[in-house]
Design a protein with these regions (language model features):
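Formylglycine-dependent sulfatase
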Residues: 1-139
Length: 139
């Protein structure tokens, strides 16, 4: 594995599905305050020309994580699982020597219905092994 050198930047990617960019003060909204996002953006590279062609949770997340269309990943609805053959942004950063973390909602491994009887000890949104798509840490 490659080692990330001391000059490699920290990378934080926010994946807010179903959030319109213009709903943030960063992009012109004046009725909402998001001071933490604003501070983070002020000291960051902000991508201003990105799009999700499928505004549904699981397909949008799969597209953002893999860079592939929903019809290619098989995520056309919310109740699907990610194939082990998919390469994600987590895999790519891990191969480059980064430690990777996923914090928040996953929603890419639910199957038809979450196993409600197993929550919260083994929630389906924190899968094991390859189903984590390259992310080391989960919260």
């Amino acid at each position: 594995m490659n080692q990330v050198n001391k000059t490699s930047p920290n990378v934080v990617v926010l994946f807010p599905d179903q959030l319109r960019a213009l709903s943030l003060p960063l992009f012109g909204e004046q009725q909402i305050e998001t001071p933490n996002i604003d501070r983070l953006a002020a000291d960051s590279l902000v991508l201003e020309n990105a799009i999700s062609n499928c505004p549904v949770c699981t397909p949008a997340r799969a597209m953002l994580l893999t860079g592939r269309y929903p019809q290619t990943t098989g995520h056309l609805i919310n109740t699907t699982r990610t194939r082990h053959s998919e390469i994600s942004i987590g895999d790519t950063f891990a191969r480059a020597g980064y430690k990777t973390a996923w914090v928040g909602k996953w929603h890419l491994h639910t199957g038809l219905w979450p196993a409600l009887d197993r929550m919260p000890q083994h929630p389906d949104w924190v899968p094991e092994g390859r189903d984590r798509l390259g992310f080391d840490y989960w919260r």
